[in-house]
Regions:
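Sec-dependent N-terminal signal peptides
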Residues: 4-13
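Electrostatic cytochrome c docking/interface patches
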Residues: 14-28, 41-46, 97-124, 144
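Short pre-active-site segment immediately N-terminal to redox-active cysteine/selenocysteine motifs
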Residues: 20, 27-30, 38, 54, ...
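N-terminal targeting signals for Sec/Tat export/insertion, comprising classic cleavable signal peptides
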Residues: 26-51, 56-64
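The canonical Cys-X-X-Cys-His
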Residues: 29-37, 92, 121, 128-135, ...
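Axial heme c-ligation environment in periplasmic c-type cytochrome domains
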Residues: 42-49, 65-99, 104-109, 142-147, ...
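Short microdomains enriched in Cys/His and/or Lys/Arg
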Residues: 51-63, 150-163
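Conserved small-residue-rich
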Residues: 118-159
Length: 203
């Protein structure tokens, strides 16, 4: 029932007063240790950008860590996820979705370009990613689909490998085969194209 309520809140923004952004910001302090003061993350593979992430998607990922469907013991312990309430999770997710890095500081919104064959990457992206993450890589917030163009390539590389190793489920489908046949060179090409879609990187 609670997850249904969150879905309704995301679908109908006028009901958003049911989540407490101020509490979300307060609760997110433990997240800031790794993900930065504004949730901007770091360019490495371990601390992704949280700012601007759709709340529905973030709630699902937090729950996946709590239920050990995604594994990161250090993160779970540091952020005390097992002791946090569902209300606090909703507030944190809503807070991070509300953070606009471009308005706070455009420098924080920059995504480093990834070297690779962007032509090949575009071909792969349009074949496997565009329908969900949109042509511009900005995702679909109302449907809980994150923006790939606003995430660090090294983190995305690691997550694609996790999908390939069956350490993480893609698109809520354990049978999903989107990444099964991608070589590392294909992944690098895909990320080269995705990073080219980021603000400030578009030619």
């Amino acid at each position: 029932m609670k997850r249904l309520l969150l879905t309704l809140l995301l679908t109908f923004p006028l009901a958003a007063q049911a989540v407490d952004l101020e509490n979300g910001q307060k609760q997110a302090r433990s997240c800031a240790l790794c993900h930065g003061h504004y949730g901007q993350g770091t360019p490495g593979p371990a601390s992704p950008r949280l700012a601007g992430t759709p709340a529905g998607y973030m709630v699902k990922q937090i729950e996946a860590y709590i239920n050990e469907e995604r594994i990161n013991p250090r993160m779970v312990i540091t952020s005390s996820l097992h002791s946090i309430s569902e209300e606090a999770i909703d507030d944190i997710a809503a807070y991070y979705e509300s953070v606009n890095l471009e308005k706070i500081n455009p420098v924080l919104n920059r995504i480093p370009e990834w070297p690779g064959d962007t032509a090949r990457g575009k071909e792969l992206y349009e074949g496997d990613c565009k329908s969900c993450h949109r042509k511009n890589g900005m995702g679909k917030s109302r449907k809980g689909i994150p923006a790939l163009a606003l995430q660090y390539p090294r983190y995305l590389f690691r997550q694609i490998k996790m999908f390939q190793w069956d350490k993480r489920v893609h698109d809520d489908d354990p049978e999903d085969e989107t990444f099964d046949e991608l070589t590392d060179q294909d992944i690098e090409a895909l990320l080269a194209y995705v990073s080219s879609l980021a603000p400030g990187n578009k030619k």
